[in-house]
Structure formats: structure tokens, C-alpha cells
Design a protein with these regions (language model features):
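Intrinsically disordered, low-complexity segments enriched in Gly and acidic/Ser/Thr residues
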Residues: 338-430
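Post-signal peptide N-terminal segment of secreted/secretory-pathway proteins
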Residues: 52-180
């Protein structure tokens, strides 16, 4: 079976705008699978940096393993995206603009082998994570509730979910009610609010990392500061400050008071109601992090077991009380279970004290890891190395055969015929897809996109009738 994975971050409020363009009829073919005898093609989202402007081009190709492509006088021009999401033979461009609505739309592969924009366009505000469930792409974010406000005027934090039905090209959102307010306050029983990182479907269940964010104004003020731990009072901000993703309000306690815990929310479906919460104290928070982005690190292996990875990003916190003492590692929830078993592996100790930025399934019980180039305790760490983690043997092996001048690694991976593929951007050359054999951790050079400066996403699509 061949899979496409797209991961990352964000939360969305979407308002569809019908644009007079191509038809949105249509049932998907074998979504997400690459049938060698199909009319499908590989699709590459590329960035082209000109002397005066930047352009974005969707290219199609026949192979990941060899050859060259060029965006010059070729492909479909588009507005670019923060994250390209391939799901069931549809390609969605999720665009995130801080503080303003971003525009996204979806694309299909036509019978003529050319990419086509579909007719509906969406406005997306802030989103912090996303995933997929059945026919829907899910975007999630935690934000202020308009309905639950305390006597100080502080708003409780709630979950906002948008459902993008890729087949019917519709967008719906969850609606808070008195019965179901979708509150994220005191989500774990310690007073802190959480955000969700990733959404991994296994069977009918949905697995999300529950990421404790600290105490909101609402949580910190609750019952005269009931949830502020003794000795942690200095962490409550006395005035507003910061900027961007690091901004905060007076009265907030930013960052968890419980950094040595890992929580997973397991939902029976995608309504995001009544989750089963499972905890382990062997690893820290189950999410990668880069600025305001939260990277999914909970993934299902081919046999349905759920592997929960933690990069221990809380080691970067400034206050010692908020630093985790736990190494980057992985635990497991067996297929069909709602509890962690005794599986555990310390990944950091196998990497000379280094952690990882993000990870994806690579087929079987293998996982591809984007490794940091130095420990999180040092400044300037960057995710420019790759490694394969074998969950069966609990062995981490760095990938060989990669170029030495890597500047960045792709946001998307693709598995096919026992190999995993990832875009690699280099300082002296064009972006290239590399093929990695998980069993040997050996990489080999694949298709090159000449004239581009970046491959921001790639996957496989079959024509939609």
C-alpha cells in the first residue's frame, strides 16, 4: 500500500466563495494510492524565485526516482500555500496569514494529465494543527469562547474545528452550544488549557496530541488562582508583552507547569466530543514545534499500532520549572487499545543528545525522523539531518547518501514500494526528491526540479471524474 502524508500545524475559520471555474462534481478514485497502471501522476508544488518576484507552480511528472522537471513555461500557476495537503485524489492549499484571512482552494488532476483549480475558494484565519478523517481534512485551533466568560471578562478557551469535505467541496465548522461548549480549559484536570497537535485516524478512532499551553487568564483567575502551583506564581505575567506567536496577556501563565507528562486525546469519531485521555510520564509533550507551528508526532504503523513520539521540546523553556527532564523518545498505544503499553525507547540517547523536529511513518514499523543538528540545550539548532527509526528493534540509524549542503527538508513524505521519499533543498543546486530505503537507511537521488528554489509539497493524484 502506498501512502501520502502531509503534516504540520494551524486552526481555521473558513468562508467559501464560489468562483466561476471548473466543475466540482466527482467521486475520488483510489485516494492516496499510487497504482502503477493508473493514469495518475506525481504532483509537485514548487516555488520559483525570480529577480523581481516569486511565483508558485504545480508541476506533474511520471517518476520520483529519476529525471528532471522544469517550471519554466510549464505547470499551473497558483498563489502558493503554507501547507499543501493531499487527500483522496484532491490537493488542498492551506494558507495561513498571521492576523488576517488567508486564501485557499483545492486542485484536481484532469483526464488530460494537467492540474486544474476547483471552483470554491476559502478564507482561512489562524490554524494550529490539522489532520484527516474519512473524506474530511480537519483543521483545529484553540481560541477564545464568546459564550463562556467569567466575572473579570476573561474568556474561556475552546476548540475550533473546520471540516473540509474534499469530495463535495464543502466547509463546515463545529458550533459551540450550552451542551457542547468544546471547552479546552482544565482539559487534563490540572486547570491548564490545551491545543491539539495532529489528528491520526486508525479505524474509527482519532488520536490527537493534547498539548498543555499553561493557564489562560480565565484559568489563572479561576477560584482565586486555584490552578497556579505553589512556587510557580512568578510565571504569571503581570502585564502584556511579546509579539507574534510569543505574545501574552497580563494574568496568563504561558507554558505548562507539568512538562514531564505526555497526554493523548482519543476520540471515537471526528466530533471532538468526550475524548478518552491517556497519559504516560515516560515522555514529554507529543508534538514537534517551530515557532507557532505544531507538528504531528502521533502516527499509526501499518499494523495499526499507534506510536507516540515526543521531541521533548520543553527543554527549550527558559524557566527551570518548565523544562522537561525527559529525553526525546517514543511510547506506544497498541492497535484497538486506549491505553499505553510498556513499550518505550529513548531516542535522544542514540543521537548523542540530539532530538528531532518531526517524523512520519515510512512503511511497516519504520519512521522517518528529521533530526536536529545539535542538542536543544544549545542555540541555533536546525532540522537538517534525517534518520530512520525501526520501532521493532528500537534502533535509530542516520540516513547516508544525502548531500552535505542541505538547507532545508520537505514538509511532505511519500511511501511507495518499500521506500520513503522526501524533498531536499540544497545550497548549491536545485531541489531534489530523495528516495530512502528504510531497511538500510540509504538515500539515493531522484527527480530534480530545475529552475525552482523549493519543493513545498508533493504527492500522487489520479484523475477525478
Amino acid at each position: 500500500m502506498n501512502k501520502k502524508f502531509v503534516f504540520g500545524v494551524f486552526g481555521a475559520l473558513m468562508m467559501p466563495m464560489v468562483m466561476g471555474s471548473c466543475s466540482s462534481s466527482d467521486e475520488p478514485q483510489k485516494g492516496g494510492e499510487d497504482d502503477n497502471e493508473s493514469k495518475g501522476k506525481f504532483v509537485f508544488a514548487t516555488t520559483v524565485q525570480g529577480s523581481n518576484a516569486t511565483s508558485y507552480v504545480l508541476l506533474t511528472g511520471e517518476s520520483l526516482d529519476e529525471g528532471t522537471l522544469s517550471p519554466v513555461n510549464n505547470g499551473l500557476l497558483n498563489d502558493g500555500a503554507t501547507q499543501w495537503v493531499f487527500h483522496k485524489n484532491y490537493l488542498y492549499a492551506l494558507t495561513y496569514n498571521q492576523g488576517n484571512a488567508g486564501t485557499t482552494r483545492s486542485y484536481i488532476l484532469g483526464d488530460d494529465g494537467e492540474m486544474k483549480a476547483r471552483g470554491t475558494e476559502y478564507r482561512i484565519s489562524r490554524f494550529s494543527s490539522y489532520g484527516a478523517y474519512d473524506n474530511d481534512i480537519l483543521t483545529m485551533a484553540t481560541g477564545e469562547s464568546n459564550d463562556v466568560v467569567d466575572g473579570n471578562g476573561y474568556h474561556a478557551m475552546m476548540l475550533n474545528v473546520t471540516y473540509l469535505d474534499v469530495v463535495n467541496e464543502t466547509s463546515t465548522t463545529n458550533h459551540a452550544t450550552a451542551e457542547h461548549p468544546y471547552l479546552m480549559e482544565n482539559f487534563l484536570g490540572n486547570g491548564e488549557y490545551v491545543t491539539l497537535s495532529g489528528a491520526e485516524q486508525s479505524g474509527s478512532h482519532l488520536y490527537c496530541g493534547a498539548i498543555p499551553m499553561g493557564l489562560s487568564q480565565y484559568g489563572a483567575a479561576y477560584d482565586n488562582g486555584k490552578w497556579i502551583r505553589e512556587g510557580y506564581e512568578h510565571l504569571v505575567h503581570s502585564e502584556a508583552g511579546g509579539s507574534g506567536a510569543g505574545s501574552y496577556k497580563a494574568g496568563e501563565l504561558v507554558g505548562t507547569q507539568y512538562p514531564d507528562e505526555c497526554w493523548v486525546a482519543i476520540y471515537d469519531n471526528d466530533d471532538f466530543l468526550n475524548p478518552t485521555l491517556v497519559k504516560t510520564d515516560r515522555i514529554s509533550t507529543p508534538s514537534g514545534r517551530f515557532r507557532s507551528q505544531y507538528y504531528q508526532t502521533i502516527w499509526a504503523a501499518d499494523n495499526g499500532d499507534i506510536y507516540v513520539f515526543s521531541p521533548s521540546y520543553a527543554k527549550t523553556m527558559t524557566d527551570p520549572l518548565q523544562k522537561t527532564k525527559l529525553n526525546a523518545g517514543v511510547c506506544r498505544i497498541p492497535a484497538g487499545s486506549k491505553q499505553f503499553d510498556d513499550y518505550y525507547c529513548d531516542i535522544e540517547s542514540q543521537a548523542d543528545g540530539k532530538s528531532f523536529m518531526r517524523c512520519w511513518p515510512a512503511g511497516g514499523n519504520y519512521f522517518l525522523m528529521v533530526m536536529y543538528d545539535r542538542p536543544l540545550s544549545e542555540s541555533g539548532f536546525a532540522g537538517t539531518d534525517l534518520a530512520i527509526f525501526d520501532a521493532t528493534s528500537k534502533k535509530l540509524t542516520y540516513v547516508s547518501g544525502l548531500p552535505s549542503d542541505i538547507t532545508s527538508l520537505g514538509k511532505t513524505v511519500f511511501t511507495r514500494n518499500g521506500n520513503v521519499y522526501i524533498p531536499v533543498n540544497v545550497e548549491n543546486g536545485y531541489p531534489t526528491i530523495y528516495k530512502i530505503n528504510p531497511a538500510t537507511a540509504q538515500a539515493s537521488k531522484g527527480v530534480v526540479v530545475e529552475g525552482a528554489s523549493d519543493i513545498t509539497g508533493f504527492g500522487f493524484l489520479e484523475p477525478v471524474k
